[in-house]
Amino acid sequence: MKNIVVVGAGFAGLWSAVGAARKLDELGVGADEVGITVVNRDSWHAIRVRNYEADLDAVRVPLADVLDPIGVGRVEGEAGAIDLVEKRLAVETANGPVVLPYDGLVLAAGSQLHRPDIPGLRQHAFSIDTHGEAALLEAHIQKLGTTPQGPGARTVLIIGAGLTGIEAACEMPARLAAAGVGDGRGILA
């Protein structure tokens, strides 16, 4: 049996796995001939471009809902060493290490936000790069309406004017108002 292993379940990884499954189905190749496995840190597909939203429930899709019906396997864990000669991928799971043999390997692990070493950035800045970080921002926004504030404390500076930054800037006034921060303002930089 041949094995295709996809590392990462973001858009690139998920579409790679789904596309491979669809193509194999079109060719009449059964799961007993070629297996597809997705390796991901958790059991969710995160729609990162929507992490600016206040309601984060809809920005994560259970991988089981997408992959199980089409016969794609899942391994939850951290991908590690790749043995290019033996064609094996080491994965650290909650139950210990696992080695996955592969005939085809797709590396779609995604990106990670680079946080420069700027004094005060880690203490006073929030990110929406991950679901967890977006949840921390939402918790902070909810506290703003009830916490005594000093000058400038109700100002939100959004750094980055790409799609996500613009979406965050457009949504921020409504989020601040919903949290009781009627005089809050957002600045897009």
Please give the residue ranges for each predicted region.
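Beta1-alpha1 glycine-rich phosphate/pyrophosphate-binding loop at the start
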Residues: 1-76, 157, 163-189
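FAD-binding core/adjacent interface of flavoenzyme oxidoreductases
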Residues: 72-155
